[in-house]
Every structure is written in structure tokens, then in C-alpha cells.
Amino acid sequence: MLRSIVILKFGLQYLALYTHTKREACFMIIFFICLTILILGYKFYSPFVEKQAGMDSTVDTPQKRFSEGVDYVAIHPVRAFLIQFLNIAGVGPIFGPILGALYGPVALVWIVLGNVLGGAVHDFFSGVMSIKEDGKSLPEIAGHYYNVVFKGFMLIFTAMLLFFVGVVFIMSPAGLLSNLDIFKDTIFANNTFWVLAILAYYFLATLLPIDKIITKFYPIFGLLMIVMTVAIAVSLLINAPHLPVAGDFLAYFEADHAHDFLAPNPDGLPTWPLLFITITCGAISGFHSTQAPIIARCLTNEKYVRPVYYGAMMCEGIVGCVWALAGI
């Protein structure tokens, strides 16, 4: 609680020194308030959610009961957190919030409310269901509690959705990498090269035991994403021009700027419902449930479910807020 208050106090003091216009002051204040709410949500709301799930640190996890050196491999909780964070984050909390920035600061509000009340809870219970059901996937759990027909439906539905998500998660990074200036006039500037390379990596990461590729490289990439997000946030603060006072938050709405917060889309597109389907990753995304079994099979204690699953989604919310602010 004290740390959250210190962060908010620092943010407001910073704004009083370094912001320039009432419009920018308002956006930055909303940003710091959102970060504080995310941290407070993890500190106070996530223990309540954990209590409802009936987590028991004394029972054996699937990793201890089914350890076979392939999928059920013990992973340190910090590594597990970074892997889960990278699994759910990717390009989603970057592209979505940047597009959602067209709707103004209300995008930040949606990310925070969706994350604390929906996304983080969803991810946490996805992990809970999997670890309580021997590390099974969502279709397998559905088949266990319903019937084989429903299991088949869930398998087909999940496969279709993952196909479309997979296409985006292949084409997007391939396009970014092939357009880098350092690869100009080389084979690496070919988009097809990166598509095939990413596909090959996907197959290897899927077929090989989890401790061969995923546990070695994912934590590094997850840490790099956190460092990148922090660097962007610091850059936004450093490059912000000189501001008057944090009290501009109220003055901003007293002036003729309320429309910037409520309906700023340049194409006149309505906030409801388009904002909520523009920004999913960072706020709430059902696709995250497909990633839950990967780490649920590797946790050595149920007490790690909350920091790994709820914590990873909270961090994704912070990533979304930073990119939304950059877009705004």
C-alpha cells in the first residue's frame, strides 16, 4: 500500500515539474493513477481471489505427481512468471493499446478495469483449473466435466482461434524484422525467410521438452520485454515538456477538453463497443487460457499460481498502459 502511494506521489510531483500543457498533465496523471490501481489490485484484490480458489500449498502439484522430463518439469517461480508473461504478452499489448489510443485516455481506464476485474482473474483461474486438473488443457477439462461431444467442439473451436492468432503472431514479427534497415539488401529482408524461421522455431519449441528451449530462452525474452517497457516509460517522462501543476487534471475537464477523454476517435467511431474489441490483451483475453497448462505442469507449489498468473497479467496491463500512453 505504501509503495503504491509513493509511486502515485512521485508521479504527481513529477508532473508538477515536467509537464507542459493541461492536456498532457491530465493524460499523465491518469497514467500514474492507473499504475497505482494495478499494483493495489494485485496487493489487495488478488489475495481475495486466491482465497476463493481454495489454493493449498501442502498438496502435490501435477509436476510432482507426473514428472517425466518433457512437459512436467520443475521450473523456478521467477522463470515461470517470465515465461507466462511472454506467452500472454507478445505483440498483443502493444498493437491493441496503440490502436486503442485513438479513443484517448479512456483506453487507459478500460485497460485497468478490464485487467483488475477481468483479465487477471481470468488468467489466474485458468491456471487454477489446469493445476487442479493435472495440467490438462481447456478442451480436456471441458470433456471431463461435460462429455466427449463438447470436448470435440472445444478442440475444433480452440484450434480455429489459435490458427488465426498464430497467423498474426507469425506475420507481425516477420514483417517487423524484414523491414529493419540493418537487413536491407540481404536475405533477412525477405518476409518469407522470417515466416519460415518463426514456424521452424514454433515446431521445435512444441516438440522438444520444455526445458530445452522454452525455459532457456523465454525468460530472457520476457525480461527484455519488461526492460523495453520500462525504457519507453522513462523516455516518455524524460521527453515530456515542462508542466505546471497536477491540479490541471480538474482544470482540463473544466475547459473544452472533455471530448478528448470521452470520444476522440478521428473517424467518429463509437467507444462502445469498438474500444473493448480493439484492446483485448492488456485488459482481458480469452486466448490466455490456452497457455495456462504450459506453466501449470511445471509449478512446484500451488502458492505460486497467484504471482505467476495474476502477476503476469498485471504486468501485461502495465505494458498496455505504457503503449497506450505512447500512442496518446
Regions found by a protein language model. Give the residues of each.
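Membrane-interface "cap" regions at the ends of multi-pass membrane proteins
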Residues: 23-24, 37-94, 301-304
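Interfacial loop-to-helix junctions that mark the boundaries of transmembrane helices
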Residues: 27, 178-192, 217-218, 262-268
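Extracellular loop-to-transmembrane helix junctions
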Residues: 28-43, 47, 100-130, 150
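Selective recognition of specific alpha-helical transmembrane segments in multi-pass small-molecule
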Residues: 34-44, 158, 162-166, 222-239, ...
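Helix-loop-helix module between adjacent transmembrane segments
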Residues: 38, 118-134, 138-207, 280-284
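Hydrophobic, membrane-embedded alpha-helices of multi-pass small-molecule transporters
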Residues: 75-92, 235-242, 253-326
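Juxtamembrane helix-boundary/capping and inter-helix hinge elements in multi-pass membrane proteins
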Residues: 100-106, 131-137, 144-149, 296-306
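Hydrophobic alpha-helical segments and their helix-loop junctions in multi-pass secondary transporters
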Residues: 166-170, 174-183, 192-194, 205-206, ...
